[in-house]
Structures are given as structure tokens and as C-alpha cells.
Swiss-Prot record:
One of its GO terms (biological process) is chorismate biosynthetic process. Monomer. NCBIfam families: PRK05057.1. It catalyses: shikimate + ATP = 3-phosphoshikimate + ADP + H(+). PANTHER family: SHIKIMATE KINASE, SHIKIMATE KINASE 1, CHLOROPLASTIC. Its EC number is 2.7.1.71. SUPFAM superfamilies: P-loop containing nucleoside triphosphate hydrolases (SSF52540). This is Shikimate kinase. The gene is aroK. Its cofactor is Mg(2+). Mg(2+) binds at residue 18. The lineage of its organism: Bacteria, Pseudomonadati, Pseudomonadota, Gammaproteobacteria, Alteromonadales. CDD domains: SK. Substrate binds at residues 36, 60, 82, 139.
Length: 171
């Protein structure tokens, strides 16, 4: 890998973007960033608080700025927020600045992986499965639209998925 390329991980909540991203960055000797963690660092508050105080629109504005800033770097792996692809500007930005990897998973896996996580504001409802299904209907076509590579994450360890990504990218 002569030039430092950016790798952007997109996909739904619970697909494993952050965990897989850390492994991938380590294996490729790249810097790892997580857009949600970066928002928390910049605001000094957790994502749930940002949602409560600024609403989803305020959160999405912050997310767009963080992704724009981080994607200016060279040689990073960036785990994006699941809803970031709903912004056409962000989709264009990611496509232009690096390789987009869609981490695909089933609704069942999403439910299993997120059921105890109280830090996901959109899932703090009576029926999180219904929310995940609704989000998938909107977002999955957008993930597919910008993906250079699609990798399924069901029933595989983060390390195995990271290796599959490296193999598919030819690194």
C-alpha cells in the first residue's frame, strides 16, 4: 500500500464498525477514528445527551462536520455513524475521499448486539426491532449505493471480518 488510503466503514448499528475498524486499522498500521467518539470528545458529552439537547438534526450537523474534518486526513480507518449515509453530502464526501466498506448484518444480529446498549438514542423505545427494520429500509440502499466493498459480519469475529476486508481490498 504505497499511498495512504482512507477506509470508511458504513453500516447499521450493531454491524461492528467500531470493533472491526480498530482491528483493521491495527492490521494495516493506520490511524483509527470513530465519528461518534469524536463528537463526544468535541462536545464533552455523550451522544444521548447531544440527541436530547440538540435533537437528531443537531447531532447530524455535528456528525457531518466531524466526518468532513476526519476524512481530510490520509491513512485512516473511520467508523461512521449508522445514519450518516442519509446525508447526500456525506455520501459524496466518503466516496470521493476513500474506500467505502459496507458492513452488512441482519436485523436479528443488530437486535442481539444492541439490546443492552443504552447509549443508542434511536433504540430507547418499546420495540427496537421495529425501529431497526424501518431504518434498514431507508439506509440499506444508501449503504449499497456508496459501497466499494460489502462484507457480511454475521457470526464472524471482528478479526476475521477485518481480514476479509483486507483480502477484498487487495492489501
Amino acid at each position: 500500500m504505497a499511498e495512504k488510503r482512507n477506509i470508511f466503514l458504513v453500516g447499521p448499528m450493531g454491524a461492528g464498525k467500531s470493533t472491526i475498524g480498530r482491528h483493521l486499522a491495527q492490521m494495516l498500521h493506520l490511524e483509527f477514528h470513530d465519528s461518534d467518539q469524536e463528537i463526544e470528545q468535541r462536545t464533552g458529552a455523550d451522544i444521548a445527551w447531544v440527541f436530547d439537547v440538540e435533537g437528531e438534526e443537531g447531532f447530524r450537523r455535528r456528525e457531518a462536520q466531524v466526518i468532513a474534518d476526519l476524512s481530510e486526513k490520509q491513512g485512516i480507518v473511520l467508523a461512521t455513524g449508522g445514519g450518516s449515509v442519509q446525508s447526500k453530502d456525506i455520501r459524496n464526501h466518503l466516496s470521493a475521499r476513500g474506500i467505502v466498506v459496507y458492513l452488512e448484518t441482519t436485523i436479528d444480529k443488530q437486535v442481539a448486539r444492541t439490546q443492552r446498549d443504552k447509549r443508542r438514542p434511536l433504540l430507547q423505545v418499546d420495540d427496537p426491532r421495529e425501529v431497526l427494520e424501518s431504518l434498514a429500509e431507508i439506509r440499506n440502499p444508501l449503504y449499497e449505493e456508496i459501497a466499494d466493498v460489502i462484507v457480511k459480519t454475521d457470526d464472524q469475529s471482528a478479526k476475521i471480518v477485518a481480514n476479509q476486508i483486507i483480502e477484498k481490498l487487495g492489501f
